Amino acid sequence: VTKRFFVTGTDTEVGKTIASSALLQAANLLGFHTAGYTPVASGSELTGDGLRNEDALALQRHSRVALRYDQVNPYTFAEPTSPHIISADEGRPIAAARLSSGLRELEGLADWVLVEGAGGWFTPLSDSLTFADWAQAEQLPVILVVGVKLGCINHAMLTAQAVRQAGLPLAGWIANDVQPPGKRHAEYLATLKNRLAAPFLGEIPWLADIAQRDDLGQYLDLRALDPALSTAPAAAHPAP
């Protein structure tokens, strides 16, 4: 059975892609055949191959399964704005069925699929659909990325509550240091650990060259996602 997780964040620009890259790297180290999926991405650049989003390219690079770009990111938009706005402007409606068919395809290729959302939990994809709606329909366990800074405690608790109200498990959370640790950093972290009531998967430190790093998996412990991982050798996960 393919393991599936949905990565959301307390806000935009809190390091979801950094955390997703770290999760893929950690799962790769455990021998899983991983696939990253960010079905909707805005803020992309025109290349010789067409529009390309740097977050989607990162997930493609860290996926153990060789994937085409369109398998990782079926909906790509140039302007860095909310997906429902730019998709309406361009006349390219985002369909939940397309998001799901892309996920099914990856489930057939990998045994560990990581889905990265856009923005925060309730990011709209259309006038009638949010990323939360789709994650709920797919019954995806959620991993929350918390950008550690002033205000993150409230944002994290609100998001965790919304995830649980959707009937989805909060499988774990990651602290991402989006700035050099400040005076109250340790206290923010302690409060989050005390109040989130979900497994803490690890803290990704502030690193200047973090987007280029291939060793971020060392900062995460995936055993909280599946206790069986503590004894699972790499050979236990053959190619599907």
Q: Which sequence ranges carry the predicted segments?
A:
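N-terminal phosphate/diphosphate-binding loop that engages ATP/GTP or pyrophosphate donors
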Residues: 4, 18-93, 97, 102-105
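Hydrophobic anchor at the beta1->P-loop junction of P-loop NTPases
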Residues: 7
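Conserved glycine(s) of the Walker
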Residues: 14-15
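Switch II (G3) loop of P-loop NTPases
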Residues: 99, 103-127
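Inter-motif core of Ras-like GTPase G domains
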Residues: 126-149
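C-terminal lobe/tail of nucleotide-utilizing enzymes
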Residues: 160-240
